[in-house]
Regions:
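Small-residue-rich hydrophobic transmembrane alpha-helices
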Residues: 46-106, 143-162, 269-333, 364-387
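Transmembrane helical elements of multi-pass membrane transporters/channels
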Residues: 14-33, 135, 146, 169, ...
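Residue-level signal for short hydrophobic patches within transmembrane helices
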Residues: 5, 9-28, 32, 55-62, ...
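Short alpha-helical transmembrane segments in multi-pass integral membrane proteins
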Residues: 1-16, 74-141, 183-239, 295-360, ...
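Hydrophobic transmembrane alpha-helices of multi-pass small-molecule transporters
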Residues: 58-61, 173-177, 203-207, 279-282, ...
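Short runs within selected transmembrane alpha-helices of multi-pass transporters and secretion channels
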Residues: 67, 136-154, 162-173, 191-206, ...
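Helix-terminus/linker motif at the lipid-water interface of multi-pass membrane proteins
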Residues: 28-47, 116-123, 179-186, 246-273, ...
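Small-residue hotspots at the loop-to-helix junctions and early N-terminal turns
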Residues: 41-54, 129, 133, 192, ...
Length: 445
């Protein structure tokens, strides 16, 4: 895909649709985990999996955030037409990914019990939650490899291939869920095992694709090494984005502690409602991914006017399409919630969360697109700091002040939209100041 010339709107949509579909598809498969557990293993098992959501989110968001680095760094080299360094960058990315994956696996195993206990996971579900999360962490190295491999593929405009690989691994995940949970009665362990196997398959497919290539994007095991200069470029963007993602999830651990105060029904209801938030957020996230890739290439080519147009189009599409799906979920929320549970108490908590959070998920596009455009120009620290202030510090202040004064489930849920508004407005200010500075810099050349 030529990101440097021609119309933008159509290309942004064509680039983003497979990304959004891939993420939604992945979430559908994750939702199948929740639905199978809730329907065939019981509310206690569902609460056990739900108790792990925040901890899983820390690692997943860290990995996804770090993967922004490879995507932006490679796209920038493509924009500069610097083909000589691309293959070195590819091998640096995947070698670093292998080391990182093993390190995260070890860390996850060590902190699992500590985090679950600290977040107030009920004793009745703690053992099941610990079993689930420890099996889940076995798949972390493969998750890193897949995300880094996909970042390489997306950098040159191919978003369809990762989607096809997710379809294959996701269908396998659902089949294994049904087999292991219903057929072999393995409960939460069965769901975790199915997830690990699907991660292995998706990783095999993406690495095999890169191995079959014979151009600058090809991968060979005997060339695995780290070029420190290339790694610095990746980490300069990836580390702030990764830390942002991880710390963002830390705030959700504190929110999860608040949810745990309301009992197993609240935990299970919040867990099922979270699936719909992921579906809607995936659309905003897809256009944010498009923003960082398109901006990186055009910034590398020195086209600031096109970079600004990318921002406005991604913001419009990200907010608009996200809200369309949100409205669909809210209008038919009773039906959607009934897919996951037959418990009236669990459903009631799920619907409250959907009405308070999912209904305005489009607001996430404001800070996601702006931060992605900033990273596309090499500015990664500032958006990370703003996101941490808006989604961690702001939420902690809310939890320790407003929520303490009005200790209700509804008030706890209100923290999400309030923090999105604060973060989005702050990110806009930084974006416009930065772009004005870039205009002056390029005009002086």
């Amino acid at each position: 895909m030529d990101m440097l010339n021609g119309g933008l709107a159509g290309k942004l949509i064509l680039f983003s649709i497979p990304l959004a579909f891939s993420s939604i598809l992945q979430q559908l498969f994750n939702s199948a985990d929740v639905a199978v557990v809730g329907r065939f293993a019981g509310d206690q098992a569902l609460a056990a999996v739900g108790s792990c959501v925040a901890l899983v989110g820390i690692f997943v968001n860290l990995i996804v955030g770090l993967a922004v680095g490879p995507n932006a760094a490679l796209a920038n080299l493509i924009g500069q037409k610097n083909r000589g360094k691309i293959n070195s960058m590819v091998h640096t990315i995947l070698t670093f990914g292998a080391v990182l994956g093993i390190a995260l696996f070890v860390i996850g195993m060590l902190v699992a019990r500590l985090v679950l206990v600290a977040s107030g996971t009920p004793e009745t579900v703690l053992d099941q939650a610990l079993l689930y999360i420890r099996i889940y962490f076995v798949g972390i190295p493969f998750m890193v490899a897949y995300n880094f491999g996909s970042a390489i593929v997306r950098s040159y405009g191919d978003t369809r291939r990762p989607m096809y690989y997710l379809i294959v691994s996701g269908v396998l995940n659902v089949i294994l869920n049904l087999l292991l949970v219903i057929g072999f009665h393995l409960g939460v362990a069965g769901v975790a095992i199915a997830t690990v196997i699907s991660n292995v398959v998706s990783t095999f497919l993406i690495i095999s694709h890169l191995y079959r290539r014979n151009d600058e994007f090809s991968f060979r095991f005997d060339r695995m090494r780290i070029d420190t200069n290339e790694l610095k470029k990746v980490l300069a963007i990836g580390i702030p984005a990764g830390i942002q993602g991880a710390i963002f999830s830390v705030s959700n651990v504190f929110i999860q502690s608040g949810i745990n105060m309301f009992g197993e029904s609240a935990i299970a209801g919040s867990s099922l409602a979270l699936n719909f938030e992921y579906f809607t957020y995936d659309i905003a996230g897809a256009f944010a991914q498009a923003a960082v890739t398109f901006t990186s290439q055009n910034f590398g080519a020195g086209n600031m006017k096109r970079c600004k147009k990318i921002f406005w189009l991604c913001l419009l599409f990200g907010f608009g399409f996200t809200e369309i799906l949100s409205v669909i979920f809210i209008v038919w929320e009773d039906f959607f919630v009934s897919i996951y549970t037959t418990s009236a108490a669990v459903a009631a908590y799920g619907i409250i969360r959907m009405d308070r959070v999912c209904a305005l998920e489009g607001l996430t596009a404001t800070y996601e697109v702006a931060s992605s455009c900033l990273r596309g120009t090499g500015k990664s620290l500032e958006p990370s700091v703003i996101t941490i202030l808006g989604t961690v510090v702001f939420r902690l202040i809310w939890l320790t002040t407003i929520f303490r004064m009005f200790t209700t489930y509804d008030m706890l849920m209100n923290v999400y939209v309030a923090s999105w508004l604060f973060t989005g407005c702050s990110m806009f200010v930084v974006y416009f100041f930065h772009m004005r500075k870039m205009d002056k810099l390029f005009a002086a050349r």
